[in-house]
Amino acid sequence: MRQPTVAGKFYPLSTKALRKEIVKCFHGLEIMSEDVIGAVVPHAGYVYSGPVAAHAFARLPKADTYVIFGPNHTGYGSPVAMSQDVWNTPFGDVETDRELGKLLAGTIIDMDEVAHRYEHSVEVQIPFLQYLFGSDFKVLPICMGMQDEDTAVEVGLEVARAVKESGKKVVFIASSDLSHYVPQEKAEKSDNYLIDAILDMDVPEIYRRKYEKDITACGYGPITAMLTAAKECGAKNTELVKYGTSGDVTGDPMVVGYAAIIVK
């Protein structure tokens, strides 16, 4: 079983406190089940990025499985790693989709728990799904240490192939923050430049803009994998539903950027 590594740090450890924190994140939002195929959500502490993430989660439909692509911040494990463990959070256990995982055997995506053991980027998304959908769903966590364009596209294509073979209803979630520790004005300018390419679903342009402006988004590979998989499964439209920064909460001059984007 994969035990939570950032409960009590990024989000509350107790069930009651966690539910209260997530309710705050959804304050003022209407929970709508739309025909969303993919999403981009941030992965900082809930007090900072939770309300932004909630804007995307509020639009997600109930699915059989949520494939969650996250960047590897720790450097541990395989370059592209899926988990097949049961994932525990303060809300309880969530099963991984082992059937979908088997369809990815022998691909660029390794089955490796080490990459996930101390990584927070996937973990922080699961309580949001539990809050909305209870325990009647599965997840397929994919941790990406390799985020180059060719790798990310291949990951997305392989996942889309497996999903089509499975016949399941699947939503793809990319976990990523945007600019890191830059002035508010620079974050907004750089992030919107990158977001425009994401909204256009233009993968080469995402990479070009990231490197042109040295934008420190940590999950550009997961975003690319999500967009690739979503497009392969019929997605044609995107929407930026919320943008914000850590400075909106802290008032600090150096901020981290967050975006909630949905793909339909």
From Swiss-Prot:
InterPro entries for this protein: MEMO1_fam
Pfam families, alphabetized: Memo (PF01875)
Listed SUPFAM superfamilies: LigB-like
Transmembrane segments: none
Family annotation (HAMAP family): MEMO1 (MF_00055)
Family that this chain belongs to: Belongs to the MEMO1 family.
Annotated protein name in UniProt: MEMO1 family protein Mbur_2394
